[in-house]
Amino acid sequence: MLRQIKPRNARSKRALEKRAPKIVENPKTCLFLRGTTCSQITQDAMNDLYAMRQVHAKRFHKKNAIHPFEDATSLCFFSEKNDCSLMVFGSSNKKRPHTLTFVRMFDYKVLDMLEFYLDPDTYRSISQFKTSKIPIGMRPMMVFAGTAFESPVPNAFTMAKSMLIDFFRGEPSDKIDVEGLRFVVVVTADEPTSSTSTNNDGENPAPLPGMTDPRSIDPSQKPILRLRVYGIRTKRSGTRLPRVEVEEHGPRMDFRLGRMREPDPAMLKEAMKKAKTPQEERTKKNISMDLLGDKIGRIHMGKTDLSKLQTRKMKGLKRGRDEDEGGEDDRTDVVEAGSGEKKKKKKVKG
């Protein structure tokens, strides 16, 4: 049940209407936060992601004493204060160095979270690539390669795919301009081995009989997510279709998935609801059109008891008493009147 806030003036009313649920939702705004300890590599990675999300992104520079998996109260406060449904929290410590935590919100409450551990050795920022920069507000194409993303059971990799799609989605549009397809984001997952297989919680499962405990394996042995960004250039090929070339634009990031928080089923069901538009034509059952354009309908009725059917009874259709006795058709009935009255004759036709 969503809470209702009563506006006090016209200005607050307009602000609430702007945040109210809509049939076509506004683009998701992403808020970038940093913890009390955040390495320079993590800050550079957040700056690169912020540059790719500009127009629909906000960034805080001050340190925040926040631990998302322990207490998410501050995240809910910042989400409601800034009207943000996506968050990227950067932190770094001895146990989990160079960590980016992606958070999705619904109704200003945490829906799900996932940790990405950045590899500092292979990371390259956008400034290290001597190529043309991506225009602000441009929507990318996305490619996910790897069997880990195709798992029928929700796990950390399927959640990572869903979060990255939400992160790079941008403004919704009905039409696609070919000239606007300027860059592509490619996310590749290494093939998991038997020793690095994970369960739905993103953690290693319990060992099978006769096998070593996978939980004792070094976290660096888990499958890697490789994120690459390429620019697209079309050149003449002498044929109808142009020749397409790609050039790496940056950033270049390699991640390992860490802790995750799965969404609550009831909250996820509420978040996935889609409102019906008034223009959407509703299909009516048992109604069709024939070749001439006439509307044909089918109705289903139960059995009717014809013995209790009420019909219209006319006075002229009533059967006479003498007709039942086999009398003549034309006869004269003598009606005895009371004492002192004359006898009256009435002609009755049977």
Swiss-Prot record:
It is found in: Nucleus, Nucleolus. PROSITE patterns: BRIX. GO terms for cellular component: nucleolus. It holds the Pfam family Brix. One of its GO terms (molecular function) is rRNA binding. GO terms for biological process: maturation of LSU-rRNA from tricistronic rRNA transcript (SSU-rRNA, 5.8S rRNA, LSU-rRNA); ribosomal large subunit assembly. Signal peptide: none annotated. Residues 28-266 form the Brix domain. The keyword Nucleus applies. Keywords: Nucleus. InterPro entries: Brix, Rpf2. SMART domains: Brix (SM00879). Residues 192-219, 301-350 are annotated as: Disordered. Residues 192-202 have a biased composition (Polar residues). Involved in ribosomal large subunit assembly. Component of a hexameric 5S RNP precursor complex, composed of 5S RNA, RRS1, RPF2, RPL5, RPL11 and SYO1; this complex acts as a precursor for ribosome assembly. Belongs to the RPF2 family. This is Ribosome production factor 2 homolog.
